Design a protein with these regions (language model features):
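N-terminal pre-domain/capping segments
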Residues: 1-55, 76-80, 87, 94, ...
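Acidic-and-aromatic substrate-binding clefts and catalytic sites of carbohydrate-active enzymes
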Residues: 1-2, 25-31, 35, 64-70, ...
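Acidic/histidine-rich catalytic cores of soluble enzymes
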Residues: 20, 83-180
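Short loop/turn segments at strand-loop or loop-helix junctions that form parts
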Residues: 22-25, 59-63, 168
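A short, structure-level motif marking secondary-structure boundaries and short turns
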Residues: 28-31, 73-75, 102, 179-180
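Active-site groove signature of glycoside hydrolases
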Residues: 48-71, 96-105
Length: 180
């Protein structure tokens, strides 16, 4: 199929894929939508395994259908829902020999290094790791403490970081704006 065609094409040009992204909302409260999302994650994991991609990456969502920021994103309830919904995806990744890597983002459920560490510890799988993007841990409310936040992330998550994504930011109109 298509996956094997891509695998041959990438091999022909000596290309490797570092991460296959699957940025869907594992905290979607709509049960039917969530079921489809979980199946989509599993399809991405299968596709990654066929392509020889070691990592499927994702962010950590929001407890609403719109995948938008709200204060509830940082609640204990949202974190518990995310962990519960992530668990079967990671179990499938284990079976397929693929790493599932979550990317902490300030506006999402896993918004800081401590919450990321908790997800890793509660799921307890070597197939769950971290995509570390330091700028994603920052917001207008905390960017002036960026050195402390980034150092804490490396200390708390360092052994479980699968990938690092580097970018910069500027403050514009009272908000952080990511720049390449």
């Amino acid at each position: 199929g298509y996956a094997l065609y891509l695998k041959r094409l990438f091999a022909k040009y000596e290309l490797d894929i570092a991460v296959l992204g699957c940025y869907l909302n594992l905290a979607n409260p709509n049960e039917e939508s969530l079921r489809k999302i979980v199946h989509r994650y599993m399809a991405h994991i299968r596709f990654a395994a066929l392509l020889g991609v070691g990592v499927v990456g994702t962010e950590t969502g929001a407890p609403n259908e719109e995948y938008k920021y709200e204060e509830k994103n940082h609640s204990e309830e949202a974190l518990e829902i995310f962990i519960k919904n992530l668990r079967p995806v990671v179990e499938y990744a284990e079976k397929m020999g693929v790493i599932m890597a979550i990317e902490p983002v300030y506006k999402h459920i896993v918004c800081n290094p401590k919450r990321a560490r908790r997800v890793l510890d509660e799921i307890g799988s070597p197939n769950l790791q971290i995509i570390f993007d330091p700028v994603n841990l920052l917001d207008i409310s905390n960017y002036q403490k960026r050195d402390t936040i980034i150092a804490e992330a490396v200390e708390v998550l360092g052994d479980d970081i699968a990938m690092v994504h580097i970018k910069d930011f500027v403050v514009e109109d009272g908000k952080l704006k990511s720049v390449a």
